[in-house]
């Protein structure tokens, strides 16, 4: 194997490596730059083996060991709530986490690399894209409603901001 890539959930980088996620936003990170002795040992073990299955098992075991020692911040529950209710607001999330909005925002950004509001916008956009890819004939007003946008014009504005296209333009360029 020349290269192994590990893709993390939004909250995992901070939890596993104690490094704020925003430092990794949009980056490919070399493990040497992370200054983590255990991670360096893992890289050496993986490099020394020629069996891909063994390499994957070593990586899985490493991350599972780290997961079992994590403090409980309950961020996974927050992600689940955001995915279930895209119209959810930050006040509700911070209340659920038993934190002030400001403290919740800081912890969330530290783990995820973006603000809760921006993350919710991304989830809404992903959901809208998914709905349009599954059914190009679905009315935009229905997509807006089901994805938690305040109205269709708000969805179109966000869609254009994220993708550079309106939903109609997107469908004509990237037909499912």
Task: Label every model-predicted segment.
Residues 98, 119-122, 153:
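Conserved structured core elements
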Residues 107-111, 130:
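Basic, nucleic-acid-binding surfaces and adjacent catalytic neighborhoods in DNA/RNA-processing proteins
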Residues 110-114, 158-168:
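A secondary-structure capping/hinge motif
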């Amino acid at each position: 194997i020349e290269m192994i890539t590990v893709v993390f959930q939004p909250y995992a980088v901070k939890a596993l490596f104690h490094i704020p996620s925003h430092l990794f936003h949009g980056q490919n990170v070399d493990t040497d730059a992370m200054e983590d002795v255990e991670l360096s040992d893992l890289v050496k073990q993986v490099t020394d083996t020629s069996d891909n299955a063994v390499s994957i098992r070593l990586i899985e075991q490493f991350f599972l060991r780290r997961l079992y020692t994590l403090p409980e911040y309950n961020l996974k529950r927050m992600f689940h709530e955001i995915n279930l209710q895209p119209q959810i607001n930050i006040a509700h999330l911070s209340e659920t986490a038993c934190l002030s909005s400001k403290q919740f925002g800081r912890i969330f950004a530290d783990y995820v690399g973006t603000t809760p509001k921006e993350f919710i916008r991304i989830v809404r956009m992903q959901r809208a894209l998914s709905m349009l890819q599954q059914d190009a004939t679905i009315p935009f007003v229905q997509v807006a409603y089901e994805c938690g946008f305040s109205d269709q014009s708000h969805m179109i504005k966000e869609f254009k901001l994220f993708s550079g296209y309106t939903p109609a333009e997107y469908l004509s360029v990237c037909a499912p």
